[in-house]
């Protein structure tokens, strides 16, 4: 693990504060196993297939969680260049340890601010299950695409997934759980819908694609 630099280490958003070491210890089975499959109705296999379709050998993971999907994905090269970027140190440390065999470089930064890191650009950037935790609606959240775009090579792809509130089929558990998460400010997606996501992506990227699986939008766009 190469600890390249620390930027904006203060964690003030509830969506970040929720990711404690204890939470991360049960995150894979509770959130990715139960919630994603039964409540959001987007099985992990769909996310993994999306990863494998877009992952490059020169990759930046943003909002790293526990590294679950990267750990189960297949890079197109034996020795990929992998970087991890997150505001939460707990997430960075857990994921870097899990993916230590790739010797990832880690960056601690707030993607809501311009990202001032000195690094060669990447061929792929993933923003998986991050947007629904960011404050505001897509006109405000969309600035993260502007901040990440300079980190992509020409032709590079930004992809990811986010849980939407509007324009998706939400069953009773999804409505109740989403309301609770928004009340606790772990989520901030009460105004998030597909049209808003598409508009935010198209403002900064080309060849934008958005597909819905349950309550989840799988999205991609290129520089």
Question: What positions do the PLM features span?
Answer:
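Conserved class I S-adenosyl-L-methionine
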Residues: 2-54
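Class I SAM-dependent methyltransferase SAM/SAH-binding core
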Residues: 58-114
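A short acidic, Gly/Pro-enriched loop at the edge of an enzyme's catalytic core
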Residues: 115-125
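Residues lining the SAM
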Residues: 128-132
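A short, conserved alpha-helix within the catalytic core of class I
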Residues: 134-147
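Short glycine-dipeptide loop
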Residues: 152-158
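C-terminal alpha-helical "lid/dimerization" subdomain adjacent to the S-adenosyl-L-methionine
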Residues: 159-210
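Core SAM-dependent methyltransferase catalytic element
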Residues: 203-223
């Amino acid at each position: 693990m190469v600890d390249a630099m620390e930027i904006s280490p203060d964690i003030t958003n509830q969506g970040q504060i929720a990711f404690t070491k204890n939470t991360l210890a049960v995150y894979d089975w509770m959130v990715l196993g139960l919630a994603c499959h039964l409540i959001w109705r987007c099985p992990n296999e769909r996310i993994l297939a999306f990863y494998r379709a877009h992952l490059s050998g020169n990759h930046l993971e943003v909002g790293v969680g526990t590294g679950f999907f990267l750990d189960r994905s297949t890079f197109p090269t034996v020795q990929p260049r992998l970087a991890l970027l997150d505001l939460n140190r707990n997430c960075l440390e857990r994921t870097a340890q899990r993916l230590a065999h790739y010797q990832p470089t880690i960056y601690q930064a707030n993607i809501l601010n311009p990202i001032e890191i000195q690094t060669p650009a990447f061929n792929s950037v993933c923003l998986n299950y991050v947007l629904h935790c960011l404050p505001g609606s897509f006109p405000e959240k969309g600035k993260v695409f502007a901040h990440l775009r300079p980190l992509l090579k020409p032709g590079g792809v930004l992809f990811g997934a986010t849980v939407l509130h509007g324009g998706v089929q939400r069953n009773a558990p999804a409505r109740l759980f989403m309301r609770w998460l928004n009340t606790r400010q772990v989520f901030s997606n009460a105004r998030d819908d597909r049209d808003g996501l598409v508009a935010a992506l198209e403002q900064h990227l080309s060849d934008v694609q958005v597909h819905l699986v349950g309550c989840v939008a799988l999205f991609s766009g290129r520089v």
